[in-house]
Amino acid sequence: MSRILAIDYGKKRTGVAVTDVLQIIANGLTTVPTHQLLDFILKYVEKEPVERIIVGHPKQMNNQESENMRNIVPFVNQLRKKIPDIPVEFVDERFTSVLAHQAMLDGGLKKKDRQNKALVDEISATIILQSYLESKKYI
């Protein structure tokens, strides 16, 4: 089987997570400077089989798209053009940063470590991917 890759796209940094080859568990992979993200993904899919890419869809509480979609849509269009054989899907990412902070607290990370924004982005991508995997179990 192939992996599923997820991204939590940010203006400066983007968290990246992947599944194991059996697509059971989501694992944080890294955080990439957003301006290097496309190259990172292209290199990754050359080395590892990737079945699909999940992109966090930022929405506000009233279900309106957040401001960051203006940056995400052009990136996704570019990604689809560069690797047309790999489907790219959006998944609601509301509350992932809150859940990431809670996971860090629950994991006993010190305050200094919890302030590491790159780690928060990576954990957020992992949460997005895990929620995607769980939603597919019940379909």
UniProtKB/Swiss-Prot annotation:
One of its GO terms (cellular component) is cytosol. GO terms for molecular function: nuclease activity. Coiled coil: none annotated. SUPFAM superfamilies: Ribonuclease H-like. It comes from the Bacteria. InterPro entries: RNaseH-like_sf, YqgF, YqgF/RNaseH-like_dom, YqgF/RNaseH-like_dom_sf. Keywords: Cytoplasm, Hydrolase, Nuclease, Ribosome biogenesis. GO terms for biological process: rRNA 5'-end processing. The keyword Nuclease applies. It is found in: Cytoplasm. SMART domains: YqgFc (SM00732). Belongs to the YqgF nuclease family. This is Putative pre-16S rRNA nuclease. It comes from Phocaeicola vulgatus (strain ATCC 8482 / DSM 1447 / JCM 5826 / CCUG 4940 / NBRC 14291 / NCTC 11154) (Bacteroides vulgatus).
